[in-house]
Amino acid sequence: MRKKSKLRSMWISLGIIIGLIVVIALVAYIAISALIKQGVVTMMDIMSTVNLAGKYFIPLGILLLLIIIGIIVFHNRSDRFNFWFKWESLLAFIGVLVLTVNIVMVGPMAALLSVQQAQLGTVSSKTLKKSAATDEDIAGEGAVLLKNQDNVLPFDGQKNVNIFGWASTNPLYGGTGSGGVGAIKQTNLYQGMENAGFKPNMQLYNFYRHYRKDRPQVQMNTQDWTLPEPKASTYSTKMMNHAKNYSDNAVVVISRSGGEGADLPKDMTNLPKGAVYYGNKGDFKKGQSYLQIDKTERQMLTKVNKNFKNVVVVINSANPMQLGFLNDYSHVKGAIWMPGPGQQGFNALGNIIRGKTDPSGRLVDTYLYNDKNSPSNNNFGDFQYSNGKRIYNSGNKGLAFANYTEGIYVGYKYFETRYGSNNGQYRRIVQYPFGYGLSYTRFRQTMSQLHQGRNGKISYSVTVRNTGRRAGKDVVQTYYTAPYTNGGIEKASTNLLRFAKTRNLKPGQSQTIHFTVNRSDMASFDQKTGKYVLDSGNYQIQLKNNAHDVVTTRQFNLANRIAYNKLPGDKKATKNEFKEAQGHGITYLSRANNFANAKKALAAPSKNTKAPASVAKNTTVPKNEKMPKATGKMPTTKAHNNLKLAQLRGKSYDNPMWNKLLDQMSVKDMQKLVTYGGYQTPAIKSISKNQTYDFDGPSGLSSFIVKNLKTTTFPAADLTAATWNAQMANDKGQQVGKEGQAAGISGWYGPAMNIHRNPFGGRTFEYYSEDPQLAGTMAANEIKGAKKYGVYSYMKHFAMNNQETNRMSGINEWANEQSIRETYLKPFRMAVEDGHAMATMNAFNFIGDRWCGANNNLMNNVLRGEWGYKGLVETDYFAGGFMNSNSALANGTDLMLSTNGAMGAKPQGLNNPTVVRQMRTASHHILYTVVNSNAYSKDAVKTANAVTLPWKKRLYTIDVVLVIILVLLECLVVYLDRRKYRD
């Protein structure tokens, strides 16, 4: 009987242990699955963390195994022995567990915990209120009136309104991923209409909410492209009769989502692996894209058109949809484009429809009747080399590539140059030109003559008069045309030169806007000489309503060709840096002989395209990556110069004090500083550097890691750009800066300024425009605004991160140098030279055969050399594989976006003086940026010595308490033993 009792006790003990293990595993699985579904982490993140921290739990596992063996082996021993064995095993296990958790928390998980446990400040209600007003102002100035037949808008005399479309109850406020929406509750579309004075038909609201409440997820790890629209047959006769009696006015909302991690589907019947669509059967035919309206939406529009006199369609999509359907319905008389307006921007939509705000936005992209006419259509997407091998640690089975064969002819520059002179053909292809937008009032613009001043300056002015009956703002757009020689340097026929927005003009009021430009602003990059040049001949500067419709033309003549050694604002001479990026055997589009090579240049690449040898080598890093040769002396380290980082605030980059400060750092200090750059820069005790925080994203400060961050979600970048108001961008930057200053956030992962190369780009909402001049102007102003309050803005993604497909698997992007410089680098150059950017995030992709983060020509020769950039450069999320920290440091990258140092983020070769010098240079860039931020403002300097973070103090306090508890438990065990087993 006693033997059975001991056996039963053994099994109970083992059952408890196994049960605890199962419960822990189940909880971990549920938590990890939730994080993956929310897009917070990927399986790669989980595996890297397990690989990094798992080894620390091996002793704990061994101890647990020994305890289990002991329970089995000793289960027949005396009761007193088993009493001691079980209790001492439990206490030992708890002690080792506490020790292990401590080692992991202050070791590999310390950087992540430093962010997750950040002690952030509270943004005042006054600042949040001002941010909300700025958000609403941007949305109001950025929304574009596309159609207003019979002056159907505004609905200023009526309150009742019907709102159709499932998206009306689930509109998009922004995109997903790093540019996603923050924690503060948004004003929804219905509330925006109510706040403007409307009374929406709530029967329709309840109908759509009953159909489906949540929006399908389009995130990094999940792409559900379902368009939840009720079938026309589900609209009951009773509900429609009520709606007709309620109002003759109807608003229809159609939205399209997008986000980080995936481009939009070109063919809804052939989705990429892992993507899903659960919409109504037959919604799309073969070859129809996500940017077309589906069958159910069309039937809904037919029903609305049949039952209501005045129908206005709201396009809630950042990506340019095919909007030809707006011409298919007799009662669809109005249309407004409003992509993600941020948390309060739908108030602006209500005010526009009500007539309280005059729409003054202009399109930032060209809208086509058929997106297949985009010049990049056949060279945007998933293309794999036929001879590619699996990229190391990327999870991709092949080597991906994309050919930018359209060259400089992106967006309107292609359509205006190729079709602009043939108005009939142009109108059949282009529905709405770049820069297009209507108003409720009328304006007349008159342009002065050109005045040529000294040093190549040209000045002119434009006077705008409100000739209508309503107050409103107008946009002034000026473009240039440079002389083109057949077969010479490629030049678009139309190029945005300068733009501005008027103040609010009452009827009869006018405003004169003055412009001064450099002749060099009209220069083209000559790949033969590696210089920007102005060819001799006649130059036109045109005042236009948009990229197509001319108001006035002025011209000047240049007698002799000018070649610029360097552009105004540059610090070093320009030379060819990207010859290899052009690739071999790729045909690029040319204007020669009226685009004679268009068919060949714009064709899709062959399925049997083979990777060049250089690609096979440079995309399998670190297998082919070698440590730099050890040269020179080891830099001074651990010096006792008694300097603190705070003392360097305001000092020039070249001040001798920097060398003395850097001498104080140990090699391990430098390694730590450059490694753990994930949403932060770490504390370094030797120089009294405090912990700082860098947060996402382009729509305002947000975080995947820190929950309940109370900051503002501003309108999407393309809506900001659609204001065509540089001051609006500056205002947005200032509010981000104010919120960052209040919260204790020093770095902002934004703005993003890649180009809308193709309508299907997943992050179109996050980028400004298809035009680099517009993008660069907006970016520079946002950066200047944030900098005013000590927040350094990470201009991103440097460079050419223009598609999401294959971006993390080392996609090789091939482009000629002219297009790289004139189109894809120009916004960044403007951000540096005009916006004085001090932080940069580079990109996952390769330019040619070199990863951006290890591209010396890009990082050192152009960014730091030509442009004179002194700030820090960080990788995009450090994902291993082709990303290698030693290679990055050697080629101009300073900081790894890593929270755990895994997957090669931690530089190796600490005894190599070359590596140490590279880390020292990187540390200089990081520290120079940080010390001139709000982290070292007058108030912040007081706490600059606080290098022991609050979460560590709490951890140490908990450790002391646990040790005391363990000691007390041990005393209790001794007491119980003596009481129970006294001889």
Regions found by a protein language model. Give the residues of each.
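Glycoside hydrolase catalytic-domain context in secreted enzymes
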Residues: 1-524, 533-547, 566-983
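Extracellular/periplasmic metallocenter environments
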Residues: 530
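Short beta-strand elements
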Residues: 549-567
